[in-house]
Amino acid sequence: MSDVVSIRDLGVTFATDGGDVRAVDGVSLTVAPGEILAIVGESGSGKSVTARTILGLLPDTAVTDGAVLLSDRTGQGAVDVLSISADELRRARGRDVAMVFQEPSTALNPVHTVGWQIVEGLRAHGRVSKKEGRAKAIDILRRVGIPDPETRVDHYPHQFSGGQKQRVVIAMALVLDPGLIVADEPTTALDVTVQAEILDLLRRCRDEFGAAVILITHNMGVVADLADRVAVMYRSRLVEQADVATLFASPKEEYTRNLLASVPKLGEGVAATVERAAVRSRARAASDAEA
């Protein structure tokens, strides 16, 4: 089976009042079926823009070049997301690729029940009866770990905790059985215990649902727990790619080494902080002496 998505020499430029800004420059990536690829980098590195391009979720001010070849869920055909029509893009969303957003509270509509919002995706891609849609919504809520789904399907977003809301958002992404799920910082707004549960659910998206996952994050600890392969972005460019074991054991780029050094290690936090403070003090003293 071919790659779920193949990004070839992607460039994204935004027109701003201060001039053109190159947010993504010459990025090439592939994701195999059933693979979890983590795209990491600091804020502003271009990782989220790269991911949103796969779903055609860029603003009108964006100008793109290159190609983003998205495979259909059968793996038998592919389309270039950058050149297809709006109708074709709409058909691909949800069915071939779906997105899990960073903030579940803003991703969910507060005036509709979660069941209605799950069924909305089904209705957008074909005729489905009210009874059938409700049954599918209950089933997917159960599969993502929402307790008492027969009752909770009629609840509104404000009646769920933050972690449960993220589970609902993941359920919405999974209901049409897409081949690829793009998760943009899916654990940032959650406490550490709930983060672990959501990461386990994303792993199940691959193991039980058969979906490939692109995980956008700056948290290298999350990468170590979940990813099969890692792509490192810095200042709009892809600077390093490797399987997760190789990247953590022998990173090639200095930027990657700095990212890995930012991961807190039990027992080393205080010593590292003291050492950094000492380095800053010596630097200030040297600067004062020169002055």
Identify the residue ranges that each predicted region occupies.
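Short catalytic/signature loops enriched in Gly
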Residues: 3, 20, 78, 147-151, ...
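ABC ATPase NBD coupling module
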Residues: 75-98, 116, 124, 246-251
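Conserved ABC ATPase "signature" region
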Residues: 132-151, 261
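A short, proline-enriched helix->beta-strand linker immediately N-terminal to the Walker B motif
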Residues: 175-179
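Helical segment within the ABC ATPase nucleotide-binding domain
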Residues: 196-209, 221
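A short, surface-exposed alpha-helical micro-motif characterized by mixed small hydrophobic
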Residues: 223-225
